[in-house]
Amino acid sequence: MSMLKKYITLSILIMMLGCNKAPKQENQITAADILGNQNYIAISYGGYRQKTRDVQPTMKELKEDMKILAAMGIKILRTYNVQLQQVPNLLKVIKELKLEDPNFEMYVMLGAWIDCKNAWTGKTPNHEIESEQNEGEINRAVTLAKQYPDIVKIIAVGNEAMVNWATNYFVRPNVILKWVNYLQDLKKKGELPKSLWITSSDDFSSWGGGDSSYHTKDLEELIKAVDYISMHTYPMHNSHYNPTFWLVPENEEGLSDEEKIESAMQRSLKFAQKQYDSVSNHMKSLGVNKPIHIGETGWATVSDGHYGVEGSRACDEYKSGRYYELIRDWTIKSNISCFYFEAFDEQWKDARNTMGSENHFGLFKINGEAKYAIWDLVDKGLFDGLTRNGKHITKTYNGDKDALKKEVLVPPTPEEFSIAHQ
């Protein structure tokens, strides 16, 4: 063999060995690789700044948000619909950022919104029939998944679309099952990547973790059809609707205010864990064993309603920050992905009431101020040089924890809660 042939042969062998040892490229990284992986922290994302979604975030605004989230280690985003331009623009922005910086890494759990017939029309919703708009929504999601296979790793069919308290739009599980099966068939045909995971993101009860009325044959088939279960749990909301775990028990009335609050937050974590376990138990009772991740959980920082001064007294930055710390610690240690709700405050959600809790779930305020939950990241300098809406990332309360704590209320006793709700 000539020296040239020997050199070429040796070069090919080295290249082959190098390829075998090289880390996966982004188009090879799959949902199975990133979900439950502590190196891929997840969050729910919406970039709306105004009181209406008629004003879409600009490409520049989306880009500054992505830089902020990447700086804090976020690598998976959950979005909710593809009806509007935000998500297509977001995917363009992520692609641009990847071209600008080979080390930039961000993946998307793409939500396709599902409605029942007459949802949001002023007419009586028909929960037995799906909206004719659903087909177009699914097709848009498919198009984007094909266009950005290196970014879109999951499609979620519906958001809280099966839970009965979503009275404006919920559908029966057979509708979700129909579209999940449709997407799974596209994977089998090679029209979508086989590694693309399909799920639906819904309340723990919709996945069989609560009332037995949800234990239907269609739900059983859905659990078998999805690649993993994406469940929601909200101790904060349940501090009003199912408050037993939240209220200060008689044997703790002698504790300090700080101890009462910490005890309530520990019980809140256990509440979320119990709901997670209930979904897992139902799934296993069907002879199914697949991953379960948390598609949504969060804790608002402001409320003038059920969770405020005259209610369960759950909402403030301290409790929200403590919940964020507790839920992150547990899920990371348990290899559970947690799409924390949410990255930034969005004021369109309760546009008529600036103090409504739905507007205040973000880790950041709209103006870019970092809430108590992530003050430590500001201290570490992770956001140095970054801005939102032209403003540098600073701490709420100017970083004064004593000022923050003046607004923190102790959870009520059962008697106090009862009097407030007479």
Give the ranges of each region predicted by the language model.
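Noncatalytic carbohydrate-binding groove/subsite architecture in carbohydrate-active enzymes
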Residues: 131, 162-294, 300, 304
